[in-house]
C-alpha cells in the first residue's frame, strides 16, 4: 500500500520510511508561527520551561498582524512584549508595523514556508500553506512554546480524504467558491482531523491564489490540514521566493484514503455562505435580496493581488460603491499594497468611495478596523461567519468571493457580478 503526500512529508520529518494514520509522532518542524494574539502566551509558556534559547532563531516566525496598527493599550503592550522576546532571541522572521502583512499571505510571499515543510502555527488558518505542498496545521500557544523549545511537535497522523476537482469553472467562480461548495457538501465536521488533499485535472488550472484560498478554509470543514499536489504552477511561484531548499512530495497511486470525492466544478456557481456557519452555503442567485451595511475585501483568504484585480475590475464598471455600504479594501501584505498602487487599483477603489486599509486581520476576527453594530449585515471575503465574528452578536456575516463582494458593494445588496 502506498502513502499520501501528507504521510510522506510527516515520515520524512520523523526520520522514518513510513507513518500510519492514527500513529502518534514527533516530527521536526521547519517553521513555528505565532501572532500578536497567541505569541504572548507562547512566550510566557516558553519561559516557564527554563530553556534559555529557542531551538533555531531562523525557524520561528512572529507576525504582529491581528490588531495592527495597535488598536489600544493592551494590544500595544502585547506587541511590545513579543518584540522584546524577538530581540532577545534574535528571531529572524519578526514582522511589525510597515513590514507586517497578514501572516498566511506574508510567509509564502517571503519564501519563509516552502514545499515539503512541516509548519505549526498558533492560528487555525495555518493550514493555508498546504497550497505549496507542505504539511501545515494550527495548534495552541502551548504547542508553539514547546516547538520553540524543542523544534518538534507531537500529534496523531491524520487519515486523508481526497477531493478530485474536475471540469472547468464558470464565470466569476474562484477557489473561494470551490471550498465553500465543498464545505457545504460535507459540513463543518466533514473532514474532522483528516487531511484534505486536493487533486484532479482542474487543479492544474488553478492559480496559487485560488489554492491558498482553498487550503486556508480546510479548517472550516474540520480538516487537520489541506494540501495540493505541487506542480509547475507551484514551482513558478516558489522558485523566485524560497529562502531555502524545498522538496516536492506526491501521493502514490495506491495510497489509501478514508473517502474520495469527485467534484464536478462546472456545477459550481458563485457561492454565499449564510450566517452562522461556513457550511450554510447557497448559490448567490438562489438567495432573496439581502441588503448589507458593509463589504470587506481582504484577509488571509482573499487579500492577494489577484483578488484585488477582480474586485477593481467590477468596481470600475460601477464607478461608485453604494452610499449605504461601507466598503473596506485590505491588501494582505505591503507587497500586495504596493503592487495594487502601481497597477492603479487603489485609485479605482478610492475614486469609488471605498476605504483603503493597511494590511491587517482587523475586522475578520472582530478586532478593529470595521466592526459591525447590532443588526448590521456584511458581505466579506473572509473565512468565518460565526455569530458575533465581526462584531455584535446580532450582526450577520455572509462569506463570498471578491467578485461578489465588489458587486454587492455597488448594488447595496448581495449581488452577482453579472448585475453590474
Swiss-Prot record:
Enzyme's top EC category: lyase
Cofactor remark from the record: Binds 1 [4Fe-4S] cluster per subunit.
GO molecular function: 3-isopropylmalate dehydratase activity; 4 iron, 4 sulfur cluster binding; metal ion binding
Keyword Magnesium applies: no
Record keywords: 4Fe-4S, Amino-acid biosynthesis, Branched-chain amino acid biosynthesis, Iron, Iron-sulfur, Leucine biosynthesis, Lyase, Metal-binding
Enzyme Commission code(s) on record: 4.2.1.33
InterPro entries membership: Acnase/IPM_dHydase_lsu_aba_1/3, Acoase/IPM_deHydtase_lsu_aba, Aconitase_4Fe-4S_BS, Aconitase_4Fe-4S_dom, HAcnase/IPMdehydase_lsu_prok, Homoacnase/IPMdehydase_lsu, IPM_dehydratase_rel_enz, IPMI_cat
One of the GO biological process terms: L-leucine biosynthetic process
Keyword Mitochondrion found: no
Cofactor(s) listed: [4Fe-4S] cluster
Pathway where it operates: Amino-acid biosynthesis; L-leucine biosynthesis; L-leucine from 3-methyl-2-oxobutanoate: step 2/4
Pfam families: Aconitase
SUPFAM superfamilies: Aconitase iron-sulfur domain
Family (UniProt): Belongs to the aconitase/IPM isomerase family. LeuC type 2 subfamily.
Protein's name in the database: 3-isopropylmalate dehydratase large subunit
Lineage: Bacteria, Pseudomonadati, Elusimicrobiota, Endomicrobiia, Endomicrobiales
Gene it is expressed from: leuC
Amino acid at each position: 500500500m502506498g502513502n499520501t503526500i501528507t504521510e510522506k512529508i510527516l515520515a520524512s520529518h520523523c526520520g522514518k520510511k513510513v507513518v500510519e494514520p492514527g500513529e502518534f509522532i514527533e516530527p521536526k518542524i521547519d517553521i513555528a508561527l505565532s501572532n500578536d494574539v497567541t505569541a504572548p502566551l507562547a512566550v510566557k509558556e516558553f519561559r516557564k520551561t527554563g530553556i534559555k534559547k529557542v531551538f533555531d532563531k531562523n525557524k520561528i516566525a512572529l507576525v504582529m498582524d491581528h490588531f495592527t496598527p495597535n488598536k489600544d493599550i493592551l494590544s500595544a503592550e502585547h506587541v511590545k512584549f513579543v518584540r522584546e522576546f524577538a530581540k532577545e532571541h534574535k528571531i529572524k522572521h519578526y514582522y511589525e508595523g510597515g513590514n507586517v502583512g497578514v501572516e498566511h499571505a506574508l510567509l509564502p510571499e517571503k519564501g519563509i514556508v516552502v514545499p515539503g515543510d512541516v509548519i505549526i502555527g498558533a492560528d487555525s488558518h495555518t493550514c493555508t500553506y498546504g497550497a505549496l505542498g507542505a504539511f501545515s496545521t494550527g495548534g495552541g500557544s502551548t504547542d508553539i512554546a514547546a516547538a520553540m523549545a524543542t523544534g518538534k511537535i507531537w500529534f496523531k497522523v491524520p487519515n486523508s480524504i481526497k477531493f478530485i476537482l474536475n471540469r472547468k469553472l464558470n464565470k466569476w467562480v474562484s477557489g473561494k467558491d470551490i471550498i465553500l461548495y465543498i464545505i457545504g457538501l460535507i459540513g463543518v465536521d466533514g473532514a474532522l482531523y483528516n487531511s484534505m488533499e486536493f487533486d484532479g485535472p482542474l487543479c492544474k488550472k488553478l492559480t496559487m491564489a485560488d489554492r491558498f484560498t482553498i487550503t486556508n478554509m480546510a479548517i472550516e470543514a474540520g480538516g487537520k490540514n489541506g494540501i495540493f499536489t505541487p506542480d509547475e504552477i507551484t514551482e513558478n511561484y516558489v522558485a523566485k521566493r524560497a529562502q531555502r531548499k524545498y522538496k516536492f512530495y506526491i501521493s502514490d497511486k495506491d495510497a489509501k484514503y478514508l473517502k474520495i470525492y469527485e467534484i464536478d466544478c462546472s456545477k459550481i456557481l458563485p457561492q454565499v455562505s449564510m450566517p452562522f456557519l461556513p457550511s450554510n452555503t447557497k448559490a448567490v442567485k438562489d438567495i432573496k435580496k439581502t441588503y448589507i451595511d458593509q463589504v470587506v475585501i481582504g484577509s488571509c483568504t482573499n487579500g492577494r493581488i489577484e483578488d484585488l484585480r477582480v474586485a477593481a475590475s467590477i468596481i470600475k464598471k460601477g464607478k461608485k460603491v453604494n452610499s449605504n455600504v461601507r466598503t473596506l479594501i485590505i491588501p494582505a501584505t505591503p507587497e500586495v499594497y504596493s503592487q495594487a498602487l502601481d497597477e492603479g487599483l487603489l485609485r479605482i477603489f478610492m475614486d469609488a468611495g471605498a476605504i483603503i486599509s493597511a494590511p491587517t486581520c482587523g475586522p475578520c476576527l472582530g478586532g478593529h478596523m470595521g466592526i459591525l453594530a447590532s443588526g448590521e449585515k456584511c458581505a466579506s471575503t473572509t473565512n468565518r461567519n460565526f455569530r458575533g465574528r465581526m462584531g455584535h452578536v446580532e450582526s450577520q456575516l455572509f462569506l463570498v468571493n471578491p467578485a461578489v463582494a465588489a458587486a454587492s458593494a455597488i448594488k447595496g445588496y448581495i449581488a452577482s457580478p453579472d448585475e453590474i
